Amino acid sequence: MSTINQLVRNPRKKKVIKSGVPALDSCPQKRGVCTRVYTTTPKKPNSALRKVARVRLTNANEVTTYIGGEGHNLQEHSVILIRGGRVKDLPGVRYHTVRGALDTTGVDSRMQGRSKYGTKKPKK
């Protein structure tokens, strides 16, 4: 235990909490323009072709974002909305695209978990 004099000379340091999504600047979402849309492979032991996009945000940051769901319409110069949330098996991917917002279409033929993929309720 420290004495009062020791604490006066050298106070206790606050723990610095590092953000998992620094490019969002404490915002829930950010808008950006796709600079490159491509597929990449996950790390071991998984195997797939994951769809990702390189995005230049409105605050001039450039980040890699994951495009969830089956199929997408994104290409270079598409304007998209991104949110936080990393992809565990893709190193360096800390953001997700928001489906159904701006230039991104929702996932067609999606029946469950529709709100996460920007799909409208099907007509009866």
Swiss-Prot record:
UniProt-listed GO biological process terms: translation
Q: Name one matching Pfam family.
A: Ribosom_S12_S23
Task: Please name every pair of cysteines joined by a disulfide bond in this record.
Answer: none
One cellular component term from this protein's GO annotations in UniProt: small ribosomal subunit
A Gene Ontology molecular function term of the record: tRNA binding
User: Where does the record place the region Disordered?
Assistant: 105-124
Query: Which sequence ranges are marked TM in the entry?
Result: none
In-chain residues carrying the UniProt-annotated modification 3-methylthioaspartic acid: 89
Task: Quote the function comment for this protein.
Answer: With S4 and S5 plays an important role in translational accuracy.
Describe the subunit structure. Answer: Part of the 30S ribosomal subunit. Contacts proteins S8 and S17. May interact with IF1 in the 30S initiation complex.
Q: Which family does it belong to?
A: Belongs to the universal ribosomal protein uS12 family.
Any idea what this protein is called?
A: Small ribosomal subunit protein uS12
The gene coding this protein: rpsL
